[in-house]
């Protein structure tokens, strides 16, 4: 064993606040918290649907609470942020070629958003 002391650089807990890239990364990752609450709310809603009309009405009243509505809006915005970042990464991760030529990145991203809009429209019509 060596007797020398290795240099250990001190890292502050807030090191990520100094870099815009890491701040954005932390913001994007923090959006999972309202999504967890949204998922729990829906799970409780399914349970109350099984329990009967009174439990269902109680859950509907709970979902009408302004705090819950705000959490759901934040969860929606977080989901849209995730979709935006993932869709913008897609052309870099998996470049698409048609007839040997690369497809423009904007077309790939717009096609993904069009697919989301189309599927959302179908869900709205069916439900």
Curated annotation (Swiss-Prot):
Gene3D superfamilies given in the database record: Fumarate reductase/succinate dehydrogenase, transmembrane subunit (1.20.1300.10)
One of the Pfam families matching this protein, by short name: Fumarate_red_C
GO CC, alphabetical: fumarate reductase complex; plasma membrane
InterPro entries, alphabetized: Fumarate_red_C (IPR003510), SQR/QFR_C/D (IPR034804)
Listed SUPFAM superfamilies: Fumarate reductase respiratory complex transmembrane subunits
GO molecular function terms listed in the Swiss-Prot or TrEMBL record: succinate dehydrogenase activity
Compartment(s) where it occurs, according to its Swiss-Prot or TrEMBL record: Cell inner membrane
Chain segments annotated as coiled-coil in the UniProt record: none
Keywords from the named record: Cell inner membrane, Cell membrane, Membrane, Transmembrane, Transmembrane helix
Topology of the protein relative to the lipid bilayer: Multi-pass membrane protein
Primary localization: membrane
Membrane-traversing stretches: 30-50, 67-87, 107-127
Function: Anchors the catalytic components of the fumarate reductase complex to the cell membrane, binds quinones.
HAMAP family per UniProt: Fumarate_red_C
Subunit relationships: Part of an enzyme complex containing four subunits: a flavoprotein (FrdA), an iron-sulfur protein (FrdB), and two hydrophobic anchor proteins (FrdC and FrdD).
Family named by the database record: Belongs to the FrdC family.
Protein name: Fumarate reductase subunit C
Organism: Vibrio vulnificus (strain YJ016)
Source organism phylogeny: Bacteria, Pseudomonadati, Pseudomonadota, Gammaproteobacteria, Vibrionales
